[in-house]
Amino acid sequence: MKKFICILLCVLMCAATVALVACDKKEETLKFGMGVHISASATDATADKEGQGKATINVAVITVDAEGKVVACQIDTADNTVKYTAEGKAVANDGFKTKYELGNDYNMVTYGGAAKEWFEQADAFESVVVGKTLDEIKALVAEGGKGTDAVINAGCTITVTEFVGAIEKAFANLADSNATASSTLKLGMSTEQSTADATEDKNGSNQVATTIVAAAIDAEGKVVAAANDCVQVKFTFDAAGVSTYDATKAAQSKRELGANYGMVAYGNAAKEWFEQADAFNALCVGKTVAEIVALCGADNYGTDEVKTAGCTILVDGFTKAADKLD
């Protein structure tokens, strides 16, 4: 009987030890990063056809483990096209949606003869990326910009060069975070347009500014990692609708511009745009999407909490993009 009791006690102690170890074991935290790949082009207006400026913004947000392998990936593209006439008049858009937001209305199946819609093909590419290193992801691009057999067989037959370009930048922007394998990656983009007609003395413009917010969100709906950026492309044209936009100059996001954005040098700001955007990012961590949206403030310059944190720029772009994380 004593022997049985001793054995039972040993078993119970071992079970308790295993339980304690299991309770103490925490999920591995991952690196988190967002990348933005931009391409822009412009055409002249003619008597028969409006000129147009097109800014294509591919965004990827990733989490990466200690071995440098992607744990999760989310991709979206803002294909912003604006127009102007041969009389130098800027044309206002009804609104802007990303390809993922358009869903079936992007019409790759109906009008393009594709087997799957864009969002389904993007999902397929994301699934291929998971578990791969950056070098392995770069190797997924085949001749002509489309994917390798592994990508095509997964259901992604569109070009993937820009996806990989965005992912490569996301790797370059990786930072330690509280994101884990159970976190959900979300991506939101909000685009605003501003226009000015051309005169004989001054070029007109049709500008699009796309604000991007990415986040890793936990099971309680709280942000555990956040990133943001803004891509502002100003398409210019003369009174005859001839494009004066320099497409040979690579478009850069505000973060990529860094100190060259010039808020301190030319705008007399205390901090550069990216520094103020970082301050807003820091406030997002620990908050729900609704709480982030509430940071906008009545004047769009942020609540007192935002201003005290060191962000004095307009934040309505951030909050509008964040609102799409739900």
Indicate residue ranges for each PLM-predicted region:
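Positively charged n-region of N-terminal signal peptides that target proteins for export
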Residues: 1-9
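A general, composition-driven signal for non-globular sequence regions
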Residues: 7, 19, 187-189
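Sec-dependent signal peptide cleavage junction
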Residues: 15-30
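Active-site- and interface-proximal helix/loop "cap" or "latch" segments in soluble metabolic
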Residues: 26-326
